[in-house]
């Protein structure tokens, strides 16, 4: 079994391409996962689809085939050229894949280092796949380690103190542009999901009143009530009124198409500071003289200061990620040797049984001596196998001994391809991440 991640993130993929590759709804995500895991060489998979990344996380039988299967499905989904997609994609295999997912969950690979949302987003991505039958024990143990790693990063560094998100960067930029004048202004937030709620909270902190807009008034009203009396709820039907009256707008819906289009603009002379925090984009490209429009990728330069401030802590955090990656693979390799040892002992038991039956049938061993002879044979073989099994366990964590272990499997005709490794987990790791 192998691990692989195919990544299209803010580091290697422009926003316009990420928009085409994004999964705006659960139905599209479920269909893609069903198609991908339908290939015999893909054991399990889940999708991380956020404003900053689209990544396919897999446990595979063949990384080469899995990689090209992902590219093929993604090119069909996004209407993109296969080879263009291949030249853009970042591929992580095995230990690189494990280190990458640990970094992602620990918020070290984010556009804003230390942002607080990604851990929950990855957990939810796995939970979705688990519930749809496309992810299970193989990726569960990866996520279990990733969550533990993220917890240690948070506890051992201050990288996540005063949690930062794209929403906070956007509000900070608005504050920078408007200065103290922002106090008392009305900020329009389109979308009542996690990002919209974060934007509303940050606007309240800088002294703004907030209008929270969504499609379902009851849901939006519930969210608005939880944020306090300075937040008003309204529906998308009244969006035109707000964008032509107030200058500050933050949009983060899950709509597959822009919700703010040029035909909604009535007052072209109104100064506007708009922040599009959605993938795909919520705000259509438009030419307005007094419009300052910031999209996801525009916030990258703004967040560079945040990277610089946290660089020292990020070094410490990356050391933790490297250690957890080594520990995970050491555990995985140690785990993989147990079925080999068990089958060696099963072969011995079968040989003892076969020879005992032959000896009894031929009269070499009287029936009354059978129990003692069987016990003696078992003790002899246990003593004979003791040193080899101990050495196998010790060498299982060393990559240079992989060929040795494979040779043992070949010598004893041992097949571990279809073994359920779950029964061999040591006690420290049995709980894992609960889907």
Swiss-Prot record:
NADP(+) binds at residues 191-196. Homodimer. This is Glutamyl-tRNA reductase. Belongs to the glutamyl-tRNA reductase family. Possesses an unusual extended V-shaped dimeric structure with each monomer consisting of three distinct domains arranged along a curved 'spinal' alpha-helix. The N-terminal catalytic domain specifically recognizes the glutamate moiety of the substrate. The second domain is the NADPH-binding domain, and the third C-terminal domain is responsible for dimerization. The keyword Oxidoreductase applies. The gene is hemA. Keywords: NADP, Oxidoreductase, Porphyrin biosynthesis. It catalyses: (S)-4-amino-5-oxopentanoate + tRNA(Glu) + NADP(+) = L-glutamyl-tRNA(Glu) + NADPH + H(+). The lineage of its organism: Bacteria, Pseudomonadati, Campylobacterota, Epsilonproteobacteria, Campylobacterales. The record marks 100 as: Important for activity.
